């Protein structure tokens, strides 16, 4: 599996991202396609004795900051790690894209660049939530402020497919949580 990783996203990037990427290569045997300021990433790896084995780097010159307006940033920062990473995913250069950067920009970028499956109007953020009996998948963790019924149905289908294929659960149950 090849995972495209935003090396510039998150509070302690690129160091924290590099540490995680190197650990993923070592423990899971995945390939990493790291997107970011290549010179800074290489220098950070060297300064901290982090091996770049299994990590291929793609240089880009811009970063979408947390304070940037998401849609404007996606449209104007074409050489940002998020935009470049999402384009690489769209081109089939990796199996997944991971970023600890701007959630809003990632959400907008996924819709505009990668696009959604037929019948899915909006992407949904998802997270595995630990529980006593069995972890569960929580979809649309507050990313969409207003959801129509057909969007909720699409989220249910996406979540069910994910839990079935990734977690190996044959007949996952679906529930609606609301405040």
Question: For each of these PLM feature ranges, what is it?
Answer:
Residues 107-142:
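Short, acidic/small-residue loops that bind anionic groups at enzyme active sites
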Residues 32-33, 125, 154-156:
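Short, charged/polar low-complexity linear motifs in solvent-exposed/disordered segments
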Residues 1-112, 161-177:
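Contiguous, glycine/small-aliphatic-enriched amphipathic segments in soluble metabolic enzymes
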Residues 134-178:
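Ligand-binding beta-strand-loop-alpha-helix segment within the catalytic cores
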Residues 5-6, 113-116, 145-151:
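Acidic/glycine-enriched edge-of-secondary-structure segments
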């Amino acid at each position: 599996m090849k995972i495209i990783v935003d090396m510039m996203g998150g509070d302690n990037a690129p160091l924290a991202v590099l540490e995680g990427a190197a650990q993923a290569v070592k423990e899971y045997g995945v390939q990493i396609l790291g997107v970011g300021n290549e010179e800074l990433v290489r220098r950070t790896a060297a300064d901290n004795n982090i091996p770049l084995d299994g990590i291929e780097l793609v240089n880009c010159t811009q970063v979408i900051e947390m304070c940037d307006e998401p849609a404007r940033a996606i449209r104007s920062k074409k050489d940002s790690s998020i935009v470049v990473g999402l384009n690489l995913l769209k081109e089939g250069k990796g199996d997944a894209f991971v970023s600890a950067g701007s959630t809003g920009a990632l959400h907008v970028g996924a819709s505009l660049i990668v696009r959604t499956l037929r019948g899915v109007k909006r992407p949904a953020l998802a997270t595995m939530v630990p529980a006593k009996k069995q972890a569960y998948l929580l979809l649309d963790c507050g990313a969409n402020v207003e959801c129509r019924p057909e969007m909720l149905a699409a989220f249910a289908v996406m979540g069910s497919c994910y839990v079935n294929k990734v977690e190996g659960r044959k007949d996952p149950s679906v529930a609606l949580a609301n405040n």
